[in-house]
A protein has these predicted regions:
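Structural marker of alpha-solenoid helical repeat scaffolds
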Residues: 51-54, 88, 122, 156, ...
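TPR alpha-solenoid repeat register
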Residues: 58-61, 95, 129, 163, ...
Length: 272
């Protein structure tokens, strides 16, 4: 604190001026974020950090900076920001959660798994971390660990939608399609506007060969989230299963326009 006061005297500016400048940058960043002006938000956050590099709130700003950079598609910068924030506050669940989400987005699932596990060392009742770690375990083929995480969620909160969605995903992977469909249906009755539920149930319907029901769920998912590329990929898979190649190709093209990997789309077409 003494060093900080000396710095203020040297530069000849009163504390309130520096503080005001810092919070003005923070407010500007907030306005840019609301307007989805990611470049403006990044610039404002960096300016705030430079204005008061010792401010105790900088860990939170680093988290916000990382998220802004992530939304802008600058994943390397986002990773640096989250990691630098964790150097300031190693036990920040918010930073760990944000970095885990970024790792998942860039397919670094092992590192995402580690961050979610770190969150659970801090708070073993964190439902979000249990849910996402369970999904990653499922993606890795570890159904035992996946089931343990989903069971833990339901033990903590028997009414948890995440716990039930996790179990439905587990049942689907294990080939128990009717059971998975039933669990999805139970959750949909309580959460009728949640797009991911219709996507999950539609996939189970596709695997079960119930294409008409899958189409209905996909239609609802598109109504709820028309910019989600996964929905169009799912619809394309249903069409490919019925040899509707040209229509499926159009859906995959739309998915790529929305951000789906073009090489993966080509691979799906080649497999059929």
């Amino acid at each position: 604190m003494k060093n900080f006061l000396v710095l203020v005297c040297v530069v000849g500016l009163p504390f309130y001026v520096l503080s005001q400048s810092y919070y003005q940058w923070v407010e500007r960043a907030d306005s840019c974020i609301k307007a989805k002006d990611w470049a403006g938000a990044e610039s404002a956050l960096v300016s705030a950090l430079r204005t008061e590099p010792a401010n105790g709130q900088n860990s939170l700003l680093m988290s916000n900076l990382g998220t802004v950079q992530r939304y802008a598609g600058n994943y390397e910068a986002a990773l640096r920001s989250y990691t630098n924030g964790l150097l300031m506050t190693p036990h920040s669940v918010t930073l760990l959660r944000n970095r885990a989400a970024l790792f998942s987005e860039i397919d670094s699932i092992d590192r995402a798994y580690q961050d979610y596990s770190q969150i659970l060392l801090i708070d073993d009742t964190d439902e979000d971390a249990l849910y996402h770690r369970g999904l990653i375990a499922l993606e890795r083929g570890d159904t035992i660990s996946s089931r343990a995480d989903f069971e833990r969620i339901l033990k903590l909160n028997p009414a948890s939608a995440n716990g039930r969605i996790g179990f439905a995903s587990l049942l689907k992977v294990m080939g128990y399609y009717p059971e998975a469909i039933e669990v999805y249906s139970q959750v949909i009755r309580v959460n009728p506007e949640k797009e991911i539920l219709y996507v999950g149930r539609a996939e189970a319907y596709l695997f079960a060969g119930q294409y008409a029901k899958a189409d209905k769920d996909i239609g609802k998912a598109i109504e709820l989230a028309p910019d989600d590329p996964v929905v169009y990929v799912l619809r394309a898979l249903g069409k490919l299963a019925r040899y509707e190649r040209e229509s499926a190709k159009a859906d995959l093209k739309r998915a790529v326009e929305l951000g789906y990997d073009s090489k993966e789309a080509e691979r799906l077409l080649e497999e059929e």
